[in-house]
A protein has these predicted regions:
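Long, internal scaffold/assembly segments composed of regular secondary structure
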Residues: 80-85, 92-225
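Solvent-exposed loop/turn segments connecting transmembrane beta-strands
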Residues: 146-147, 173-182, 272-276, 289, ...
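Internal, well-ordered domain-core segments that constitute the primary functional module
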Residues: 1-103
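Membrane-embedded beta-strand positions of outer-membrane beta-barrel proteins
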Residues: 34-36, 83-87, 165-169, 205-207, ...
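Transmembrane beta-strands of outer-membrane beta-barrel pores
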Residues: 19, 38-44, 87-93, 160, ...
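Outer-membrane beta-barrel "beta-signal"
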Residues: 12, 349-366
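Short loop/turn motifs that connect adjacent beta-strands in outer-membrane beta-barrel proteins
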Residues: 20-34, 72-84, 158-164, 196-202, ...
Length: 366
């Protein structure tokens, strides 16, 4: 839910263990995978153009940071089960902002300048790595610098002879209260997949269920001297009071089931439907060594946000049917035809067809 392929990639410098590395001395029972990265957002022009003619906030020249660590327990040579778990986090920070709003409960609201240059020094890079510091419009209610968010992951795999299965879960969080167990983890992504023995009909089945409707509840209040109790709620996934939305060039950087700001009609760089429930189904097969196919279907309902709820939930139904042909006569060549459609009220209804040709390998020269 935190990072995916929905948005344009961010240029970044990345230090990574891309594959699991076995920890010496564990007899292949423990392995780790990790990365750390820093990058630079490249959507300055898009943000200015999208908000042009409005008083909506936008930013430019902000930085990106991500990090992750995963531990895998299991030795498939000795036992068919492996358990993988880990933490993934990311942050948008620094840059410059225009039309930024102050906190409505900040006593210095009258003197707040909506044009702000955020901190871009070494300390900000450290605050992104170890969440700390505060934002320019936090006022007296100091929080964490930048748009910090993350996900906990857990996956159990069964490695059978000629077949396999997996179940997995992901918990997304926007703050400390959901990073740990201050409130129950009601919002989750659950999934399962089965890889079948070799046959000409069906090779893989996938099911996933996503829920983001709780968000720690509908009430939020920072403690004050007169009312010292903190109430952590209204997490409003993918939203941030400085950077607007967890997006790059208009597209959500996590799951596209929380609609991207690009679809907003009023020029707001913000998620307008962060409370959703969705079911996803997928099948894949290889009728022959040259032909493959896949079918994906997703149904979702969206309730808007706690601050701007929908009276009736909007619905979306999405279908993709795709077939590929890779002839043996030309190794590396693949021809793909796809049909997709969007139905329901969440997005405009649409249908489309795509034909693609790809080649992987060296082109021989005479």
């Amino acid at each position: 839910m935190m990072l995916g392929i929905n948005a344009r990639p961010i240029p970044q410098v990345r230090l990574e263990l891309p594959d699991f590395w076995t920890i010496p001395g564990t007899k292949n029972w423990l392995a780790i995978k990790a990365h750390i990265a820093y990058g630079l957002y490249t959507d300055n022009r898009w943000q200015r153009h999208f908000t042009e003619g409005t008083a909506n906030p936008y930013t430019a020249n902000s930085f990106f940071h991500s990090k992750a660590g995963f531990l895998r327990v299991g030795n498939t040579d000795r036992f068919p089960l492996t358990l993988t778990g880990g933490l993934e986090m990311a942050c948008q920070f620094g840059g410059e902002g225009w039309n930024l709003p102050p906190r409505p409960d900040d006593p210095n609201i009258a003197t707040f300048d909506p044009h702000q240059k955020m901190s871009n020094g070494i300390k900000s890079f450290w605050n992104a790595f170890i969440p700390s510091g505060n934002d320019v419009n936090d006022g007296e209610f100091k929080n964490i610098e930048g748009n910090q968010l993350g996900s906990w992951h857990l996956r159990l795999d069964y490695h059978g002879k000629g077949w396999g299965a997996a179940v997995y879960a992901e918990h997304f969080f926007e703050d400390h209260s959901q990073m740990f167990w201050q409130y129950p983890w009601k919002d989750m992504l659950y999934g399962g997949s089965v890889r079948l023995p070799k046959n000409p009909v069906l090779s893989t089945l996938v099911y996933e269920h996503l829920r983001t409707t709780d968000q720690s509840g509908p009430i939020y209040h920072d403690g004050t001297s007169t009312f010292p109790d903190n109430i952590y709620g209204t997490d409003n996934y993918y939203y941030h009071h400085v950077y607007g939305a967890w997006q790059h060039a208009g597209f959500t950087m996590g799951t596209p089931l929380l609609p991207s700001p690009l679809y907003n009609q009023g020029g707001q760089i913000a998620p307008l439907d962060s409370r959703v429930k969705a079911h996803h189904f997928g099948i894949k097969g290889n009728p022959s060594s040259e032909v493959s196919y896949r079918v994906l279907y997703t149904h979702e309902k969206a309730w808007g946000t706690y601050t701007a709820p929908r009276t009736n939930p909007a619905k979306g139904d999405y279908l993709l049917v795709e077939a590929s042909y890779a002839p043996h006569q030309v190794k590396g060549l693949s021809i793909t035809a796809s049909y997709g459609q969007n139905l329901g009220s969440l997005f405009d209804k649409s249908k489309g067809v795509m034909v693609g040709v790809s080649y992987t390998g060296w082109i021989k020269r005479n």
